C-alpha cells in the first residue's frame, strides 16, 4: 500500500499530538520525545509531527510517499531520474526511529519529497 506522508514542524508538541489524535480519531503509531507518527487509514495518510527544531512551527518539514518495498523506492527513483529530476538515493538511512531505503527530490522551491520504505523499526531517531 502506498500513502502520502506529511511531516510537520510543531511548536507545542503535546498539543499537536492531542489535536491530530482527535482530528483523525486515532493515536500515534509511534510516539517518541519530540516525534510522533500517525498511520491514518481514512484518509490514507502518514502524518508525522516534529517538535519545531528543524524549522518554525506550523511549517512543512518535508513530504513523502511511503511504499511497500525497496523495489518500489528504486522504481520511483528511476522514474524521477528519467523525467529529468535530480534525485538523491539514500538506502539504509536511519530516520524517524526506523531503518529506511529512500530517494529524495526537491521541488522548484526547494521543498523536499521522499519515496521511502521502512525496513525495520529502531530505537534511535
Regions found by a protein language model. Give the residues of each.
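Core segments of cupin and vicinal oxygen chelate
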Residues: 2-46
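Vicinal oxygen chelate
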Residues: 3-11, 39, 55-125, ...
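Short linear motifs in intrinsically disordered
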Residues: 25-30, 68, 91-95
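A short linear hydrophobic-aromatic micro-motif
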Residues: 27, 47-48, 86-91
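Short, solvent-exposed loop/turn elements at beta->coil junctions and helix N-caps
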Residues: 35-37, 52, 91-95
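Conserved beta-strand in the GNAT
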Residues: 46-50, 114
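A short, sequence-level motif marking secondary-structure junctions
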Residues: 51-55, 120
